[in-house]
A protein has these predicted regions:
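Ubiquitin-like/PB1-type beta-grasp interaction modules and other compact soluble beta-rich domains
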Residues: 1-66
């Protein structure tokens, strides 16, 4: 199993996961969001090619409109 820290919570995932696969599990389809991996923003174009490793720290931020 792969242990990731997402928005401060420790979670378990199957091995060989990339950012795009992780995002797909988070019900973010159609939403505007940003992913930070170990302190670095991962561009959307790199989600499918950015592998996740045991112990990685992620912050996933969803943009919320309002006024």
């Amino acid at each position: 199993m792969l242990t990731l820290h997402i928005n401060g919570e420790q979670k378990q995932f199957p091995p060989d996961l990339n950012v795009a696969q992780l995002v797909a599990t988070m019900s973010l389809a159609g939403k505007r969001f940003a992913v930070e991996l170990n302190g670095e923003i991962v561009p959307r174009s790199g989600h499918a090619t950015t592998p996740l490793r045991d112990g990685d720290q992620l912050e996933v931020v969803v943009a919320v409109g309002g006024g």
